[in-house]
Amino acid sequence: MTHLSDLDIANQSTLQPIKDIAASVGISEDALEPYGHYKAKIDINKITPRDSKGKVVLVTAMSPTPAGEGKSTVTVGLADAFHELKKNVMVALREPALGPTFGIKGGATGGGYAQVLPMEDINLHFNGDFHAITTANNALSAFIDNHIHQGNELGIDQRRIEWKRVLDMNDRALRHVNVGLGGPTNGVPREDGFNITVASEIMAILCLSRSIKDLKDKISRITIGYTRDRKPVTVADLKVQGALAMILKDAIKPNLVQSIEGTPALVHGGPFANIAHGCNSILATETARDLADIVVTEAGFGSDLGAEKFMDIKAREAGFDPAAVVVVATIRALKMHGGVAKDNLKEENVEAVKAGIVNLERHVNNIKKFGVEPVVAINAFIHDTDAEVEYVKSWAKENNVRIALTEVWEKGGKGGVDLANEVLEVIDQPNSFKPLYELELPLEQKIEKIVTEIYGGSKVTFSSKAQKQLKQFKENGWDNYPVCMAKTQYSFSDDQTLLGAPSGFEITIRELEAKTGAGFIVALTGAIMTMPGLPKKPAALNMDVTDDGHAIGLF
């Protein structure tokens, strides 16, 4: 049987005018800033909130295969299923990054009949948010280098500048660069480097800000580097927070689009979950809560990364409790964690599913540690067999875990009704949500708590550099920030080859980064990179554009 590609399905779909999508959730035309017929920015100052806030349903996943387990697909499909059940619902997603689109993912707007549209626009440049973030980030780099060139009144030590330039592309050649070469008229030579845009602190700040004032305040607190006597230098010292916020004045507005089935969708912000906090913007989520009874959102990769950061960083900052959490599982991921090679994942292997279930079990138990009841969604693939699916269902029944088979990729919202009904039962019950740790704990104890309670590790080792940073950060008053772990998404450990549910391992923190504007400390583990590289055969090799301007090869 031949299946249509995601792009073919998207191109065959009929979109509703964006003003009609807006009207369906009470957004007036006065609050709408259209970008063509099917996309718009929302002026949140012109929205009238309802008396009660909508409930948040978080979608996370087990540890993924390199291809991903369809978390965005399930997120969109679940929202469509609520729509099918006549619920007042919105979906809130992150924006895709261009780098991974051309690298391995080929796009990130859901899949099959559970997509947000217009798919081409969202996957490419959308409404320009990432370009604005890239520009603001690199403008700050220019201001720093100019300040040093013009006499360096603040005494910035160019050997200790923490701020890097960014680009929305996977480009390993730019990880380490030298700038200011070519003589005195070209600035002061120093070492620099590039991160991918989604790792920029500006991205994190945009996603954690509640208003332009809040955005400006957070930008002003960014630590760009240190003086020669190791005192922090901030954007406020450079006096450019106003200029940077001005660049972002439109980017901070949430973007309204729609699913194939006409469910309103806010797609805004896009930090990665392995190198940043992995959640869409607070503004988009809160705007959706002002307009809908149920808001379905997602956090990147598995519960050990995106969901943990959603609970400990985003929900804490925003001041809301998730009403339910969906953990997406696939038969292929279970088999991979059960020891099956990636080339053999399409073959039936119930024993491997049994062996790999420990990975899903740990993710389920992790969610319970936050005081929220999880619901497992088996995201159906055409190569799954009845025996494999039945084993997972029987495991769930034996362990008193809610579970539903979802077929939203093939059937859209109708394929997610069973999951939606399970989630409805959960959100109607009270929960006892609480973050994993208190902010008053020392940084090293917060890191140890994540490693031992969420990852299953036994010990944290800090490099000599990280130990010095812990001491310095405490002296600077940064000890009460939450922690954002930078770790491989493929394993609970910092070794991506250690699959399943390993225990007793040690995790090494090689370096810490103070994101004082965003308000968290990044702990870098293993070989994690903040500027990815492209694979040997990038998805770009299969991409093209037709003579009439339509994309080919997005998926």
Curated annotation (Swiss-Prot):
Reaction catalysed by this enzyme: (6S)-5,6,7,8-tetrahydrofolate + formate + ATP = (6R)-10-formyltetrahydrofolate + ADP + phosphate
Query: What sort of enzyme, by top EC class, is this?
Result: ligase
GO biological process terms held by the UniProt record: tetrahydrofolate interconversion
The molecular function terms of the Gene Ontology recorded here are:
ATP binding; formate-tetrahydrofolate ligase activity
Q: What is its EC number?
A: 6.3.4.3
The answer to whether keyword Ligase applies is yes
UniProtKB keywords = ATP-binding, Ligase, Nucleotide-binding, One-carbon metabolism
- Say if the entry is tagged with keyword Iron-sulfur: no
Recorded metabolic or biological pathway in which this protein acts: One-carbon metabolism; tetrahydrofolate interconversion
Q: Name one Pfam family in it.
A: FTHFS
Q: Which InterPro entries match?
A: Formate_THF_ligase, Formate_THF_ligase_CS, P-loop_NTPase
Q: Write out the residues that bind ATP.
A: T65, P66, A67, G68, E69, G70, K71, S72
- Give the source's domain of life in one word: Bacteria
Q: Where is the signal peptide?
A: none
Instruction: Please give the family membership noted in the entry.
Output: Belongs to the formate--tetrahydrofolate ligase family.
In Swiss-Prot or TrEMBL terms, this protein is called Formate--tetrahydrofolate ligase
- Which species is listed as the source? Staphylococcus aureus (strain bovine RF122 / ET3-1)
